Amino acid sequence: TFGGINLEDIKAPECFEIERRLVEELEIPVMHDDQHGTAIITSAALMNAAEMMGKNISDMKVVVVGAGASAIACSTMYKELGVKNLIMCDSKGVIHKGRTDLNKYKKDFITQTDITTMNEAFTDADMVLGLSKPGTFTIEHIKLMS
């Protein structure tokens, strides 16, 4: 037999600490579906989109709208795949260096650009991943994309 743990519907940031502790203390696989399942599926979509557009992943502008467990896991995986221009937005807008209200997990995704607004984030974006509440972005934002 083979055992493992699948965590489900645990909100951020608590889910990161729970997962970390389980991984450290147990010798069985631990998966948080909200993080890892979403990251795997959307990474496949990102790779397919890059191929279809004839672009290198490292040259793509990726916007992640949402900053919970799924968004952080997806963004982490995208960086591992080579995305260099990743802009994360939470309920207060773009996660940028001028923000003073960020937890340690969001701080890892402070944009390395001068972008501070959603309109700037969406302008010429190659991909947008929406992992936030409905209405966070609009069709007007989509029209700003590549």
Predicted region positions:
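Glycine/serine-rich phosphate-binding loop and adjoining beta1-alpha1 elements at the start
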Residues: 1-60
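Short, well-ordered coil/turn residues at beta-beta hairpins
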Residues: 8, 130-131
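Glycine-rich nucleotide phosphate-binding loop and flanking beta-alpha elements
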Residues: 11-13, 71, 135-137
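Short glycine-/acidic-enriched loop or helix-start segments at secondary-structure transitions
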Residues: 16-17, 74, 98, 138-140
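Rossmann-fold NAD(P) dinucleotide-binding segment
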Residues: 18-25, 115, 123-124, 133-146
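Glycine-rich phosphate/diphosphate-binding loop of Rossmann-like nucleotide-binding domains
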Residues: 40-129
